[in-house]
Curated annotation (Swiss-Prot):
InterPro entries: Aldolase_TIM, DeoC, DeoC/FbaB/LacD_aldolase, DeoC_typeII. Pfam families: DeoC (PF01791). The keyword Lyase applies. Its EC number is 4.1.2.4. Pathway: Carbohydrate degradation; 2-deoxy-D-ribose 1-phosphate degradation; D-glyceraldehyde 3-phosphate and acetaldehyde from 2-deoxy-alpha-D-ribose 1-phosphate: step 2/2. Keywords: Cytoplasm, Lyase, Schiff base. It is found in: Cytoplasm. It comes from Escherichia coli O1:K1 / APEC. Belongs to the DeoC/FbaB aldolase family. DeoC type 2 subfamily. GO terms for cellular component: cytoplasm. One of its GO terms (biological process) is 2-deoxyribose 1-phosphate catabolic process. This is Deoxyribose-phosphate aldolase.
C-alpha cells in the first residue's frame, strides 16, 4: 500500500462526514448516512444539525452501522458569548440524542480581551455533556483569531474548561483549517501534557487526500504514529471523502459538497 493510500484509509476512518447547510433536508442527511458507510470502512461520525439527529440515528441503524457516531453543533456558527443560550442548545442537542457536540467558543469575546466567558461557556457545556456521556469538541475559529497567541490562548482555555477535542473552524468563515493553525493547536495539547485525554479536529478546507496526509503527518511528528485514532483525531469535512475514496481506488474523486 502506498503512503497516500495508507494515510487515506486512516483519514477516512477519522472523518466526521459533515453537512451543515441552510438547505439541509432529511433526504440529504439520509444520503450522508449512506455515504458514511464506504466499501473500505466507515467514517468515525457524521456531523449534522440537531434536528436531523433522529432520522440519522434511524438510518444508521437500518443500514447496519449503528457504531457511526452522531455529532452536532451548538452556539453555531457565530460563537456568541451568551452562556445560557449555548448551554440550552447543548442540552437540546443531547436530548435529540447526539453522541458528540461541537460548540463554538466565544472567540470575539476573547479577541476583545475577555478570557473568562470562554472558560465559563465551555465548562457549562462540558458539565452537561459529561453527565450524558457525550463528547465535547470546542471550535475556536482560528481563521478569525488569526494571531498565534490568541489561537494558543483559546486552545488553552478550552482544554482547562474540559474540552475533549479542540477544533479549528466552523467552515463558515473565509479562512478555516490551515496546517499552521493545526500545528499550533496540537503543540498546545503537547505542551499541556494532555494528549492522552484531548483530541484535535481540523475542519473546513481539508479537501484532498494530500491535504489529509499533511495534517496527519503533523500529528505523527508531535505524538507518534499511534496517537491519531478516532478518540484523538477527527477531520471535519465532506468533499474530502470522495478524494480519499479515489486515492483508495473507489470512485472518481468528485463530490457534491465543498465543506
Amino acid at each position: 500500500m502506498t503512503d497516500l493510500k495508507a494515510s487515506s484509509l486512516r483519514a477516512l476512518k477519522l472523518m466526521d462526514l459533515t453537512t451543515l447547510n441552510d438547505d439541509d433536508t432529511d433526504e440529504k442527511v439520509i444520503a450522508l448516512c449512506h455515504q458514511a458507510k464506504t466499501p473500505v470502512g466507515n467514517t468515525a461520525a457524521i456531523c449534522i444539525y440537531p434536528r436531523f439527529i433522529p432520522i440519522a440515528r434511524k438510518t444508521l441503524k437500518e443500514q447496519g452501522t449503528p457504531e457511526i457516531r452522531i455529532a452536532t453543533v451548538t452556539n453555531f456558527p457565530h460563537g456568541n458569548d451568551d452562556i445560557e443560550i449555548a448551554l440550552a442548545e447543548t442540552r437540546a442537542a443531547i436530548a435529540y440524542g447526539a453522541d458528540e457536540v461541537d460548540v463554538v467558543f466565544p472567540y470575539r469575546a476573547l479577541m476583545a480581551g475577555n478570557e473568562q466567558v470562554g472558560f465559563d461557556l465551555v465548562k457549562a457545556c462540558k458539565e452537561a455533556c459529561a453527565a450524558a456521556n457525550v463528547l465535547l469538541k470546542v471550535i475556536i475559529e482560528t481563521g478569525e483569531l488569526k494571531d498565534e497567541a490568541l489561537i494558543r490562548k483559546a486552545s488553552e482555555i478550552s482544554i482547562k474548561a474540559g474540552a475533549d477535542f479542540i477544533k479549528t473552524s466552523t467552515g463558515k468563515v473565509a479562512v478555516n483549517a490551515t496546517p499552521e493553525s493545526a500545528r499550533i493547536m496540537m503543540e498546545v495539547i503537547r505542551d499541556m501534557g494532555v494528549e492522552k485525554i484531548v483530541g484535535f479536529k481540523p475542519a473546513g478546507g481539508v479537501r484532498t487526500a494530500e491535504d489529509a496526509q499533511k495534517y496527519l503527518a503533523i500529528a505523527d511528528e508531535l505524538f507518534g504514529a499511534d496517537w491519531a485514532d478516532a478518540r484523538h483525531y477527527r477531520f471535519g469535512a465532506s468533499s474530502l471523502l470522495a478524494s480519499l475514496l479515489k486515492a483508495l481506488g473507489h470512485g472518481d474523486g468528485k463530490s457534491a459538497s465543498s465543506y
